[in-house]
């Protein structure tokens, strides 16, 4: 925080071991940190994501998104979230319904801004056509080992629509440090 990095980005699914335990664990841990030092809350931009349900796998229905956001807030012990993102596209929920969930959360003062994570360009455009509260972010996987957003139109869409691109896994899941699964010539350049 003292270096100016104030975005704290988490998700309800972070901490899940996919064996059925740990859902919400990272948000709970962050909640303990914020409870131990409440002054931190005013120094961070809090971002979280929802919409992944183990075994389903995705649910972006208005009822689920609203309840997932409220549950995230309880786990973190906060009364509002600056940025809430849909974690992955749900093919079975119409973008109009997602937009309605965003409007409801914003209208209640629970969330300031909204975005998407792991959405294609066309999925983002479909949601943009329905939102009342504008999207502000798109969060693709993006690193020097994963350059697809430069080629698939994601970064172009961000520029066109004024979305902030938030890279997830910018260090390629740690592989840039270890070299595992990375082309040797890229590792040589990074070293």
Language-model features: locations:
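N-terminal binding-site loop/beta-alpha segment at the start of enzyme catalytic domains
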Residues: 1-44
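Active-site groove signature of glycoside hydrolases
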Residues: 73-92
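Acidic (Asp/Glu)-rich catalytic clusters
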Residues: 2, 31-45, 70-77, 104-106, ...
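Beta/alpha (TIM)-barrel catalytic core signal, keyed to glycine-rich beta->alpha loops juxtaposed to Asp/Glu
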Residues: 89-191
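A short, structured active-site edge motif that brings together acidic residues
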Residues: 42-54, 141-142
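Active-site mouth loops of central-metabolism enzymes
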Residues: 50-66, 87-93
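Glycine-centered flexible beta-alpha turn that most often forms the glycine-rich phosphate-binding loop
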Residues: 8, 81, 114
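A short acidic, helix-capping loop that chelates divalent metal ions and anchors anionic groups
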Residues: 14-19, 53-58, 174-178
């Amino acid at each position: 925080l003292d270096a100016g990095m104030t975005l704290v980005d988490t998700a309800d699914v972070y901490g899940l071991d996919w064996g059925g335990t740990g859902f919400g664990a990272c948000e709970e841990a962050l909640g303990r940190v914020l409870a131990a030092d409440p002054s931190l809350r005013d120094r961070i931009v809090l971002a979280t994501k929802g919409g992944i349900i183990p075994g389903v796998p995705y649910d972006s229905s208005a009822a689920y998104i609203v309840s997932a956001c409220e549950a995230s807030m309880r786990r973190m012990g906060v009364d509002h979230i600056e940025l809430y993102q849909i974690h992955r596209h749900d093919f079975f929920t119409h973008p109009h319904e997602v937009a309605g969930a965003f409007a409801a959360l914003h209208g209640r003062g629970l969330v300031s801004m909204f975005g998407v994570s792991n959405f294609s360009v066309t999925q983002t455009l479909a949601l943009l056509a329905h939102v009342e509260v504008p999207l502000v972010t798109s969060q693709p996987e993006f690193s020097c080992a994963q350059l697809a957003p430069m080629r698939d139109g994601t970064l172009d869409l961000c520029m066109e629509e004024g979305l902030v691109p938030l890279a997830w896994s910018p260090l390629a899941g740690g592989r840039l440090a270890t070299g595992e699964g990375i082309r040797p010539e890229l590792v040589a350049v990074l070293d």
